[in-house]
Amino acid sequence: IQSAAVITLALNVVAMLKQEVRRPDLTDHARARPTFGTAWQDFITLPQARRLLWALGLGTMGFTMQDILLEPYGAEVLGLSVSDTTLLTAMFAGGMVVALILTSRHLGKGSDTIRVASTGILIGIAAFAAVIMSAPLQAPALFQIGAALIGLGNGLFAVGMLTAAMEFGGDKMAGLTLGAWGAVQAAAAGVAMFSGGAIRDLVTGWADAGLLGVALQSPASGYGAVYHIEIALLFVALAAMGRLVRRPGEVGENG
């Protein structure tokens, strides 16, 4: 733990050395600046701005509701040891790293950012299906593969949507667009993590009380309900992103 803290401190110091220098022409207090309300109104009236934020929020919730549930699911439903459940975090992070590498290569070749994000959603849907099926099959390996694929899909979606936001508003609205992206992503993630835990506890209580029938009187029922909701959210996000995809010959939404 101490080694990780030292490495984190060192990386932050290195990052500070490469920060962009302040530009006096842009930070001059005499420079005319629109109010936040005016700037926000200009942004939100852009074509597809609301759709972009809705797709981001729904997709983020779809990937994040499981955030606090994967490890207890592995232990309670599949009987994994502490070391095995801890390994899930590494597998999830490994999927994210692979996603960053793949995204860098594809976007560097001019791939559409929304298509990249959509690919991440499709991978996420398959990943949650694998996690769900690992319970009745009692297949820890399938569960671990699903966890890694969740990381991969989440990484592709997050980077794809972030890059789309950077391109969306053009140079004049880049800062506001990224701020909106961050606010929606953080709010959706917070709501998703709370909702995931609450829904799991609620459905598990119903299952234990026999309200869902004998077939669902299992510890997996609460987790499964959350994973099915996540799949539904990802499908809705995918549908919302359809009209954001660039058509052949288009440079960008506002390019």
Say what each PLM segment does.
Residues 1-6, 201-232:
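A membrane-interface helix-boundary motif in multi-pass transporters
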Residues 6-25, 238-245:
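C-terminal membrane-cytosol helix-exit motif in multi-pass small-molecule transporters
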Residues 82-83, 169-184:
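Loop-to-transmembrane helix entry/capping segments in MFS-fold secondary transporters
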Residues 156-170:
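Intracellular juxtamembrane helix-capping segments at the cytosolic ends
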